[in-house]
Amino acid sequence: MKFLVLALTILLAAGTQAFPMQADAPSQLEHVKAALNMYIAQVKLTAQRSIDLLDDTEYKEYKMQLSQSLDNLQQFADSTSKSWPPTPRSSAPSCDATATVRAEVMKDVEDVRTQLEPKRAELTEVLNKHIDEYRKKLEPLIKQHIELRRTEMDAFRAKIDPVVEEMRAKVAVNVEETKTKLMPIVEIVRAKLTERLEELRTLAAPYAEEYKEQMFKAVGEVREKVAPLSEDFKARWAPPPRRPSKSSWLSTRPSARP
């Protein structure tokens, strides 16, 4: 791909000298300016397209330098064109000459494009060829590595599966064995706790009876003190007895006749 960089450099150098100005022909100044600007624009466009085909990883620095050179060339052409003194508008023969030069420039651009197209195709073909070669070299190694890891995993699984099953069976047996050894300890602790609880109940029984008697005595005393108050309350707030009416008194009076 370095030949492409060299070709672009030669193309830029040739483009800058394709149309030398004639100082002794001021009548052709506008014609030369137009032709030069158009040619430089076409050269820059074609060169930029060719630069874009270069690989960014390998030719990144060259691409930046060439792009900067193209920009500098365009700026130089613009500044030079603006610095030239103005001239009268060209006549009809001058316009014909400009059209002829424009046609020649377009022809040169098409020729360059035609010449670069096969080179670009060849470059693409070479790159694809190299990539295929790399893939053919690396693909067996990658497959071998994958198969090796798969084989190692299968072998490891074949070794660990029986161990896992054995451990599962041992865990079940060990749980029963542990339970057998643990139950006597649990029974001893439970018996000791039961014994201590009975001792506490025996020790607390007299105190409970005494507390019960004191509670009954206190309740009786409270009841004796509250009973007079209750009777007095009933006497104070009880409704007065009903007096019999006159009709009822006459009806209940004994008759005078025998």
UniProtKB/Swiss-Prot annotation:
Residues 32-63 are annotated as: 3 X approximate tandem repeats. Residues 64-258 are annotated as: 10 X approximate tandem repeats. PANTHER family: APOLIPOPROTEIN, APOLIPOPROTEIN A-I. Keywords: Cholesterol metabolism, HDL, Lipid metabolism, Lipid transport, Repeat, Secreted, Signal, Steroid metabolism, Sterol metabolism, Transport. Residues 233-258 are annotated as: Disordered. GO terms for cellular component: chylomicron; extracellular vesicle; high-density lipoprotein particle; low-density lipoprotein particle; very-low-density lipoprotein particle. Participates in the reverse transport of cholesterol from tissues to the liver for excretion by promoting cholesterol efflux from tissues and by acting as a cofactor for the lecithin cholesterol acyltransferase (LCAT). The gene is apoa1. The keyword Transport applies. InterPro entries: ApoA_E, Apolipoprotein_A1/A4/E. GO terms for biological process: acylglycerol homeostasis; cholesterol efflux; cholesterol metabolic process; lipoprotein metabolic process; phospholipid efflux. Its main location: secreted. It comes from Salmo salar (Atlantic salmon). The keyword Secreted applies. It holds the Pfam family Apolipoprotein. Belongs to the apolipoprotein A1/A4/E family. Sequence repeats lie at residues 64-85, 86-106, 107-117, 118-139, 140-161, 162-183, 184-205, 206-227, 228-238, 239-258. One of its GO terms (molecular function) is phospholipid binding. Major protein of plasma HDL, also found in chylomicrons. Expressed in liver, intestine and muscle. Residues 1-18 form the signal peptide. This is Apolipoprotein A-I. It is found in: Secreted. Residues 246-258 have a biased composition (Polar residues).
